[in-house]
Amino acid sequence: MVKILLSMVIASLSASAYAYDIALTPLHGFAEQVDKPYGKNISLHGTPQQIVRLRKWISQIASVPKGLDTLIRIQSSGHKLFITHSAYSLVSSGRTAAPATSNLINGIGESVDISFNANIPDTGSHQVLSNGQQLIEYTAAQNLYHELAHALHMMNGTWRFFASERQAIEEENEFRRQLAKSQQRPFSERVHISGVPICPRASEVPDESWSQQLICRNHR
């Protein structure tokens, strides 16, 4: 889900006060960066365990050609990407934000913040609808890729102002298609509808390690 910061809020922040000035963890360790074609402009923020999980999901994303291409294009944008854990990312467990300037659509781009719930299980916190109107998986890696797709276009100035969610889902579906092929599984195309939380049954206790109860309550 995209959340563009209000212009009046951004105007009150100097460029040096944006999120990238706080203590961050690089996506790759120094030795790893030499061999990686992506990630030099990506920083993470969270507990050590959350950093491990974010790195794992990004590694899974990079193992798919579409995912690797997205990460390479994010690096070549020349802007910074900050990914932080947030237990309050309730709509599909992620949201992407950038300064609300014309650079988002004029080919220049902006630096971007992704807030993502790094505590969700690998299987994901939500499901999404296929074009056959069936609920299908929305794993943590697929969810994070969706946010990276938003970031890709914001950072390259190719963001569709009135159709940003459709744009990200188009990218996500190509990622899903390639992922399904690599896993030798059937491909299910996602439609342009927000995710549906995976909620506990009446007899089950909510899993508070990833704010399941809060996510489900917010959906009602």
PLM feature spans:
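Positively charged n-region of N-terminal signal peptides that target proteins for export
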Residues: 1-4
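Sec-exported extracytoplasmic/periplasmic mature domains
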Residues: 59-66, 149-157, 173-180
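An amphipathic, basic-hydrophobic helix/alpha-beta surface used to engage anionic
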Residues: 144
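A metal-dependent hydrolase signature that marks the N-terminal structural subdomain at the beginning
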Residues: 18-98
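Hydrophobic h-region of N-terminal signal peptides that target proteins for export
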Residues: 10-18
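Metalloprotease/metallohydrolase-associated module, dominated by Zn2+-dependent proteases
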Residues: 112, 138, 158-220
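Active-site scaffold of zinc-dependent metalloenzymes
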Residues: 93-141, 151-154
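A mature extracytoplasmic/lumenal domain signature
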Residues: 28, 46, 87, 118-120, ...
